[in-house]
Amino acid sequence: MTTGLSNPAVREYLRVVALEYALFRQESGEWLEQYKFEALPSLNQQLDVAGISAENIGKIVETLRKGNPQRGTFVHFTNIVDLTNLSAKEPQLTAELLRGLFDESRPLAARIEAFRDRARQVMPEIRLGTPLFGYIMAAFDMVRYLLYKDETFRRITSLLGIE
């Protein structure tokens, strides 16, 4: 028995679902996320991992705040407010943590957990949700760090029989 993408029935099902979804979005006009495709390229041009420093971390966080629209946001505003407060309180640490997110010699989960752990040592109540990290990384490089909704990703991988 073939499973996952090797199963012709699954492949045809996914093709039809993708087509129907695209048609629905075009016809209904309900797809209100075009802003993401406009905001991320602009952020990618403004932000550079190599340029992260304690001296400019406030400006970087402000750029992230401004790039996160009021409606249909990438990340809840409270996470950006907390990141702003962290950068004001501990600019050196914040710059170090932000650079650490892009250290690909370590697994992504470890990088995010290290960021959270060290930030909570300074601000125990800081809110640093998963969407914040996805947004930060996509803001620096939207090609390398794609944004996707975790629930949708998990459902698709389950459907395809991918662990």
Give the role of each language-model region.
Residues 1-126, 141-163:
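An N-terminal alpha-helical hairpin/helix-loop-helix interaction module that forms a charged
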Residues 133-140:
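Contiguous, well-ordered alpha-helical segments that form the cores/surfaces of helical PPI scaffolds
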